[in-house]
Amino acid sequence: MLEINISCPNVKEGGIAFGQNPKAVEAITKEIKKRARQPVIMKLSPNVTDITETARAAEAGGADVLSLINTLTGMKIDIHRQTFALANKTGGVSGPAIKPIAVRMVYQVANAVKVPIIGMGGITSAEDALEFILAGASAVSVGTANFYDPAATIKVAEGIEKYMEQHNVENISDLVGIVK
């Protein structure tokens, strides 16, 4: 699979990240699909008014899978130097603080498109991962947690297996999107 990150808040084109423009998302997805030999995952930006618009655009362009969310745009100010702490003034915020937003967006997108979703954003435990799955993610991705615990992903997977045993769930797909 090939994941295309169309949502980096640090790279701008004409003042707006092109991943925030549904027409641009559909067009770039179509172009990539014409050339790609493998399934295409489009990584969506959360920095939009309605993420379902860009999700539908990516699906219309032929995306095989959607991954969401990428980082939220944030800012840090160095109070001692009284200036921006980041070279671009703004940058991506990730980790546990964005999880409630990410779960909401996965839920919204899962109810708007038919393609599978990889949920991400603040997953540090099996409980976090299960929230994404119950909201509609077919798979999850663990990022920031791996920096402070290299075994985080293994712990998440083991915790999901334990949950499934405790709840007599044979196939994880039986949990995908069951919270309505």
Model-identified regions with their sequence ranges:
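A short, charged, Gly/Pro-tolerant segment at domain boundaries
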Residues: 173-180
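Residue-level recognition of conserved structural "scaffold" positions that shape functional pockets
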Residues: 102, 128-129, 150, 166, ...
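Alpha/beta enzyme core
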Residues: 1-118, 124-135, 139-142
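C-terminal helical cap(s) of enzyme catalytic domains, especially alpha/beta-barrels
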Residues: 77-91, 133, 145-170
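Small/polar glycine-rich anion-binding or flexible loop at a beta-alpha turn
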Residues: 123-127, 149, 180
